[in-house]
Regions:
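N-terminal loops that bind phosphate or other acidic moieties
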Residues: 2-342
């Protein structure tokens, strides 16, 4: 067969939840590309939810905080060059209470996240990035706001919340609390409590959190931190900025992206949707590799003319037990089928 021109590939990927980290996925793609003589830049990405801390350098500190239901929790976070990166799930996450079944959706508090922010301030952080996602809480951030004793110091800090959703403040209960174990009656109670929290923030801090897109992230934590002066930023944009995504995209011939499950939410600010959009704007060919692709997402990909593969469809149960191998095989198959990417 004709020797293929080497292609510069950008592996800009999210985690495959439960089976492979974003870094492992990027590595698998790179190994497959390199075995065929192509160059590959590995760029693990995240959307502000779980996995963001890992993508932005990983934790280098551990603190004891109060977990969502009052029990002590050991939270990992990062402080480097006066930039703190805090993943709220480490302090106030649903996984700390054993999932929805072990949660008390009404009692669950963000106090531990506030304690981490307070500690970051005490240690001299000049920039604080709070990543939301995976929360047990719908307290509107009241627990965190109370725990931040040094909030006057926040005025001189670049304070950013990386939001993984665009949900509005008062909608947080109805949209997400059922996944955190809330009954219908509790959802109504939590909605009323969010209304009260919004009134409180407006009266005390002069900030109308109801008007902010993304303020409902992590059960309204994003809104509470916005009341203290945080900027709410789409998580993907923040991560892409930190890791130099735009420059890497401009420099490549082909983009490969992917995540564990592709569905309608993938196009609402999540990694794959954003990478597909960016590649389209830059007129770069793109391949999407996912564990599973639901029918809506499949239709969207067809409409956009984007090459896509579902591992589950092609490899069955191996897609879960040997995810990175399946990813590498998919990449190799694609590169052989489509020799001329340019």
């Amino acid at each position: 067969s004709a020797t293929l021109e080497p292609v510069r590939v950008l592996a800009a990927v999210d985690k495959f939840r439960g089976t492979a980290t974003a870094a492992e996925v990027a590595r698998a793609i790179a190994v497959a590309c390199q075995s065929l003589g192509h160059d590959c830049v590995e760029m693990p990405l995240a959307d502000g939810g779980e996995g963001t801390l890992q993508v932005l350098g990983g934790p280098n500190r551990t603190s004891q905080v109060e977990g969502p239901l009052g029990l002590p929790a050991t939270a990992q976070w990062r402080l480097h060059d006066a930039t703190a990166i805090i993943e709220m799930a480490q302090a106030s996450g649903l996984q700390l209470v054993g999932g929805a079944a072990g949660n008390d959706a009404v009692l669950a508090s963000t106090v531990g996240t506030g304690q981490l922010i307070d500690e970051a301030l005490a240690l001299g952080a000049r920039r604080i990035i709070v990543c939301v996602g995976g929360s047990a809480t719908t307290d509107g951030g009241l627990g965190a706001v109370q725990a931040i004793t040094k909030h006057k110091m926040l005025r001189d800090v670049d304070f950013i919340v990386a939001c993984d959703v665009r949900t509005m403040f008062v909608d947080a209960a109805e949209t997400f609390a059922p996944q955190k174990g809330a009954t219908d009656q509790q959802v109504r109670f939590l909605t009323a409590r969010l209304e009260g929290a919004a009134d409180h923030y407006l009266a005390r801090f002069g900030v109308d959190v109801r008007a902010l897109s993304g303020s409902g992230a992590a059960g309204g934590l994003a809104g509470g931190l916005a009341a203290l002066g945080a900027r709410l930023v789409p998580g993907f944009d923040l991560v892409a900025n930190e890791v130099g995504f735009a420059a890497a995209l401009a420099d490549c011939d082909l983009v490969i992206t992917g995540e564990g499950r592709l569905d309608a939410t993938s196009f609402a600010g999540k990694v794959v949707g954003e990478v597909v959009q960016s590649a389209g704007a830059d007129e770069k060919p793109i391949v999407v590799i996912c564990g599973e692709i639901d029918s809506d997402a499949h239709s969207t990909m067809e409409r956009l003319g984007v090459s896509h593969m579902g591992l589950r469809e092609r490899f069955g149960d191996l897609a879960v037990s040997r995810t990175t191998e399946c990813i590498a095989r998919s990449v190799a198959l694609h590169m052989r089928d489509q020799p001329d990417q340019r």
